Swiss-Prot record:
Catalytic activity: di-trans,octa-cis-undecaprenyl diphosphate + H2O = di-trans,octa-cis-undecaprenyl phosphate + phosphate + H(+)
Cellular compartments annotated: Cell membrane
InterPro entries (alphabetical): P_Acid_Pase_2/haloperoxi_sf, P_Acid_Pase_2/haloperoxidase
GO cellular component: plasma membrane
Membrane topology value: Multi-pass membrane protein
Name of the gene this protein is made from: sepP
Name of the featured protein: Undecaprenyl-diphosphatase
Amino acid sequence: MRKYYYWILLLLFLILSIYIKLIGGEQNIGFNVELFKLINYNQIATLNGLMVFLSKYGREYVWIPVTALLLIFKRTRKIGITLVISFVIAIVLGEVSKYVMAQLRPFNFVNPTYLLEPKPTDYSYPSGHALIVSTGAVTLLLTSPKWMWILGIIEAVLVSYSRVYVGVHWPLDVIAGWLLGSWISFLSVQIESTGPIKKIEQMLKA
């Protein structure tokens, strides 16, 4: 069954990416612009600090320690190794996708945009934050106990939402990040279970 999810996720990401390219950019998709405004224009002052914190620190400051902790213990090392594989693939494919797609961020088109952090200078699509946190969360979903992946999913959703909330990403950037990240998670689980990676695991357990 996982093989079907694998191909569906990749296909959806590719279809969305091609569509965005064909129409000349995310700014030309009406619901994408309106959903951005709905989220960004309805900021709640008491939540701004939390959203900025999640946007700035919800990626590296959560997933690096989580991965390191899982690698330390033999019982969870397999999960940690799968996360490492996932993140390496996500970083590479994420950067390649950004430069292939070359999509500008919403503050270049939507006026006003209520920015809560400095303007990023790189491209927008897909969201690197959404890509990494979704990769981590879905990898946990596929490999770890229920309590662990539930926490991962909650954290990933909040971080992804925060990127639109603070004004630095289109909603479709986040959706694309989740599609690509989820596909990478399925791929990484397959990679971990076969070939040289399995031999490395066995050596570490010895």
